[in-house]
Amino acid sequence: MDSSVPGGQRTLQKRRNAQLQKEKKANQTPASPRQAGFGGSSSSILKLYTDEANGLRVDPLVVLFLAVAFVFSVVALHVVAKVSGKIF
């Protein structure tokens, strides 16, 4: 019976280094969501959207106006349908 490490000394060293890296990474990760930066404020949500994202960039105020205009157009169409149904 041989008492040497399976795979040799290099494999043992690689295992030790991998374990040390794993422990170091575990120590660096925050333990709670608040430590991770998600403290319940809306600023943490805004960090998810960066300028590096591809696609159409639209100001939030423009989106708000378009949404309100859409709601008003639906209401106007309902009113027109009711009025035209009573006239004709």
Swiss-Prot record:
Region: Disordered, residue numbers: 1-41
Gene Ontology process terms (BP): intracellular protein transport
Keyword Transport attached: yes
Keyword field contains Ion transport: no
Keywords: Endoplasmic reticulum, Membrane, Protein transport, Translocation, Transmembrane, Transmembrane helix, Transport
Subcellular location: Endoplasmic reticulum membrane
Region forming the signal peptide: none
InterPro entries assigned to the protein according to its UniProt record, in alphabetical order: Sec61-beta/Sbh, SecG/Sec61-beta/Sbh
Residues in the Cytoplasmic compartment per record: 1-60
Role: Necessary for protein translocation in the endoplasmic reticulum.
Family to which this protein belongs: Belongs to the SEC61-beta family.
Protein name: Protein transport protein Sec61 subunit beta
Species assigned in the record: Kluyveromyces lactis (strain ATCC 8585 / CBS 2359 / DSM 70799 / NBRC 1267 / NRRL Y-1140 / WM37)
